[in-house]
Amino acid sequence: MAEKFSLSKFFGMNDEYDDDYAEEPTPATKSTPTPPTRPNDSRKVVAMRTAKPNASHIAICEPRIYSDAKSIAKQLTNGDAVIVNFARVDEAQAQRIVDFLNGTAYAVGGEIKRIGEQIFLCTPHNFEVSGDVAANLGTQVTR
C-alpha cells in the first residue's frame, strides 16, 4: 500500500488538499447583446472587371512554323476563340496546322471555320458563330 501512495504522489494525486472549501458566488452581470455590424455601404463604385467575369476573349495569331499550333491550341482549350492567319506559312504547313487545330476544336466541343482566303476562326464550345463568309470568298469586290 505504500507503493500506491508513492505512485499517486508521483502523478500528482495527493490526498493532502482540502475538499471542503466554499466558493463565493460571483454576481451575475448583464451583458447587452451587440447588434450585428453591417458592412460599410459607402463603396458605390464597382470595378468593370467584377461586373463582367465571363467576358469572352478572341486571340489573333499568325503562325510561322508548325510548333506555333501548340500555343494556338492552348488558347482554344482555355476557352478563347482564336483567329488564325496563315499568310506567313506555306500551304503544306498550314494544312498540318489546320488539321491539328481541327482535332483540338473537336476535343473541346468547338469548331473551326474558314473566314478568309488564309484566315480561320477556331472557337470553343461556348462561342456561337453565325453567317457564312466562305461562300463569298470567290467573289471579290473590285474598285
Swiss-Prot record:
Looking up InterPro entries in the UniProt record yields: Cell_div_SepF, Cell_div_SepF/SepF-rel, SepF-like_sf
Q: Which UniProt keywords apply?
A: Cell cycle, Cell division, Cytoplasm, Septation
Cellular component (GO) terms are: cytoplasm
State the Gene3D superfamilies in the record. SepF-like protein (3.30.110.150)
Per its UniProt record, what Pfam families does this chain match? SepF
Instruction: Report the subcellular localization.
Output: Cytoplasm
The protein's matches in PANTHER family, at most eight in alphabetical order, are given as: CELL DIVISION PROTEIN SEPF
Similarity field = Belongs to the SepF family.
Task: State the name under which the record lists this protein.
Answer: Cell division protein SepF
Q: Gene behind this chain?
A: sepF
